[in-house]
Amino acid sequence: MATELIENKLKLLPEKPGCYLMKDINGTVIYVGKSKNLKNRVRSYFKSKQVGRRAELVREIRDYDIITVSTDKEAFLLEITLIKKYQPYYNVQLKQGTGYPYIEITREHDPQTRLTSVVHKDGGYYFGPYPNVYAAQATLKFIRKVYPLRRCHGYQGRPCLYYHMGQCLGACFKKVPQKEYDEQIKKIKSFLNGDITSVKQDLTTKMEKASENLEFERAAEIRDQLKYIEETVEKQKIISNDNTQRDIFNYYVDKSWISIQIFFLRQAKLLRRETRMFPLTDAADPEDAFTSFIVQFYGQKNRILPKEILIPSGFDDDTLAEVLNVAVRTPQRGQKKSLLDMAKDNAKLKLDDKFRLLELGNRKTKGAQKEIFDALGLPYGHVIESFDHSHIQGADPVSALVVFKDGEPDKTSYRKYKLKGEVEHQNGGDEVRNTREVVRRRYGRLLREHKKMPDLILMDGGQIQVDACEDVLRNELNLNIPVAGMVKDDKHRTNHLLFGDPINGIPLKLIPLDPKSEGFYLMTRIQDEVHRFAITFHRRRHAKNALSSRLDSIKGIGPKSRNKLLRNFGSLKKIKEASIEDLRAAGLTLPQAQTVKLML
């Protein structure tokens, strides 16, 4: 079942490709997935019945995060990086060391091209990773045919088979000039970086010619070759071919708030990102706030500067670079510009989500509270107060007060009341006395201190509690505060509000709320909260009084000694576990400590 937080976030999902990170109650990433349409995919986890391992996953999800990208291919590549970074429990497809392949140009005297699953800091050139392993193999095969380097094991005194096939420059029997290697490597790098127009044109011409000559198998082979080249050499934004350590900053401003997105690229991978959002002061300029944030960001403890920082246009790169002592650049085109744009898109997405969540929150808070006031025919009020009583067969009676402001609990205003007299039985008369006492104490004090009264009082009960509350307010305190009762059905479920206006001759009547409405949800929340608060307070008081009673029965332990024990140990169990020395340290004499140990 989705939490309230998840339900709200599901309404904000974009219909874009990207990755989603499912988190458990501790905020740990337990699953990473990708989709062409984040809205449909993420919603499917919570809006349809799940079975097996997926059902187990959904039961653990307490929150999620998303990263949007431009294409499904980028989502696939980002998913690889995120899985390797977080090693989520429910991801079994990608383990450390068994990832997708890269195409490598080795850094050797006689270099070669090959597939590898591990990127080493050896000066070689790495391209990838490639999700389609077969396509990567086919592309490597094409490169070796069109841009040959070395295919053999090195010098052996005679030409190898690949040399005769035109797939080796001849390191097997001669010294190949470095210039020749450099020219080939330049072509391979250009090809793998996306410059494939001429190659595609050449292959397309050959495919058409083969088809005209009725060489259909040959034409199909070239067609597949084109497909594999497009799949592996397509430009990638998430996995860069540049291994420079790089941080990318961009921002988005709306409604006097700024959202700043930071991408951290390490070893050609987007390892993580951070989002910071904060309101702008009236005098703050967004550009100044952005640059100030960057400087403060790297001023934090344990924050390591990258080799390069990318920021959008409109800023003094040189000054920022001088302050940070690192290269600061503003790309105008190409892959870096695309990454910068992606950072801005994600900054906007995060800020839009924040505003939409606030709007949804207002519907669940202020909007819900308005529904309650509307149902009662009252003008909107900001403050609702609610009471509940608790006791066990009349022992240790207490009352509790909770306060909700604009639909949100204001816990600093909560109050606990120890009721003065004990009651003998739990009946209507007891409820009347408890209600009258706590209402008199609460609102009598507000009157004496000249404090603002609530806009509505909700009593956890029916006509008995409502009548008792209104009698004290109007006849003793001369206050006219609306009072309603939260009535439960025979299954102890909140059912209706009980409300009337005795002053104007309107009798009490049951007022229903739509069980699916936000107002009904808020009413049950208030009722559950005041009940919880009262029960918790009563349990603590009852336990303390029970302990006091047990201590009072011990000969030689008077009120002062009892209070010392209560203050130092708090519970009967801890007093029992205490040693003679511990009891003496709490202020008891040796005979008293020995008596306590003997009696307990």
Swiss-Prot record:
One of its GO terms (biological process) is SOS response. Its main location: cytoplasm. InterPro entries: GIY-YIG_endonuc (IPR000305), GIY-YIG_endonuc_sf (IPR035901), GIY-YIG_UvrC_Cho (IPR047296), RuvA_2-like (IPR010994), UVR_dom (IPR001943), UVR_dom_sf (IPR036876), UvrABC_protein_C (IPR050066), UvrC (IPR004791). Residues 197-232 form the UVR domain. It comes from the Bacteria. Keywords: Cytoplasm, DNA damage, DNA excision, DNA repair, Excision nuclease, SOS response. Residues 15-92 form the GIY-YIG domain. It is found in: Cytoplasm. One of its GO terms (cellular component) is cytoplasm. One of its GO terms (molecular function) is excinuclease ABC activity. PANTHER family: UVRABC SYSTEM PROTEIN C (PTHR30562:SF1), UVRC/OXIDOREDUCTASE (PTHR30562). Interacts with UvrB in an incision complex. The UvrABC repair system catalyzes the recognition and processing of DNA lesions. UvrC both incises the 5' and 3' sides of the lesion. The N-terminal half is responsible for the 3' incision and the C-terminal half is responsible for the 5' incision. NCBIfam families: uvrC. Belongs to the UvrC family. HAMAP family: UvrC (MF_00203). This is UvrABC system protein C. It comes from Lactobacillus acidophilus (strain ATCC 700396 / NCK56 / N2 / NCFM).
